[in-house]
């Protein structure tokens, strides 16, 4: 039995050796290779993160550099313009010294106007503040003042009523005369015709009364003769 066991063990070892020889790689080597692969992948992941961070950090720096480059030509242009403007201003006083005198004279009135304009709003504000304070004071004293003003207002009204009546009485005759004078000629003509008719009627009345008297006297005379 022991011999059989030894033989079987040898056969199993031989089978394992044959498999290793066929594969050409031992299990230890496989584990080592797997570990190296894992480490390599991990290292690659870390390096990628670093590269991304570096790119993100480089992007703002690149943008800042681009802005600086863009601003540089603009600043150069502004400096050139300022240089040209200063040159022209230097040339202007040299060529026209007389022009400065009117400009100075014009600046003086403008400064005076500015001073007046600044003083006017300040005065207006002070006046408005005073009016507001006065209005508040009057509103505070309004109940007592109203109570005092009540009888005082009634007395002037009563005094004004007879004066108005006397004025109306004095003006009525003058108003009638003015109305008569202002009447149109048609009304005056009608009034004159009415007066003439009245006079004719008045003249006719005594004649009729005389005729009636004569008629009465004739029958009486006839009766006497009879």
From Swiss-Prot:
Keywords: Calmodulin-binding, Cell membrane, Cell projection, Cytoplasm, Developmental protein, Differentiation, Growth regulation, Lipoprotein, Membrane, Neurogenesis, Palmitate, Phosphoprotein, Synapse. InterPro entries: IQ_motif_EF-hand-BS, Neuromodulin, Neuromodulin_C, Neuromodulin_gap-junction_N, Neuromodulin_P_site, Neuromodulin_palmitoyl_site. Residues 1-226 are annotated as: Disordered. One of its GO terms (cellular component) is filopodium membrane. The modification Phosphoserine is found at residues 41, 86, 96, 142, 144-145, 191-192. The modification Phosphothreonine is found at residue 172. Pfam families: IQ (PF00612), Neuromodulin (PF06614), Neuromodulin_N (PF10580). It comes from the Eukaryota. Gene3D superfamilies: 1.20.5.190. GO terms for biological process: astrocyte differentiation; axon choice point recognition; axon guidance; axon regeneration; cell fate commitment; nervous system development; radial glial cell differentiation; regulation of filopodium assembly. It is a peripheral membrane protein. Residues 85-97, 128-139, 159-192 have a biased composition (Low complexity). Expressed in hippocampal neurons, with highest levels of expression in the CA4 and CA3 neurons and lower levels in CA1 neurons. Expressed in the dorsal root ganglion. This protein is associated with nerve growth. It is a major component of the motile 'growth cones' that form the tips of elongating axons. Plays a role in axonal and dendritic filopodia induction. Identified in a complex containing FGFR4, NCAM1, CDH2, PLCG1, FRS2, SRC, SHC1, GAP43 and CTTN. Interacts (via IQ domain) with calmodulin. Binds calmodulin with a greater affinity in the absence of Ca(2+) than in its presence. This is Neuromodulin. The lineage of its organism: Eukaryota, Metazoa, Chordata, Craniata, Vertebrata.
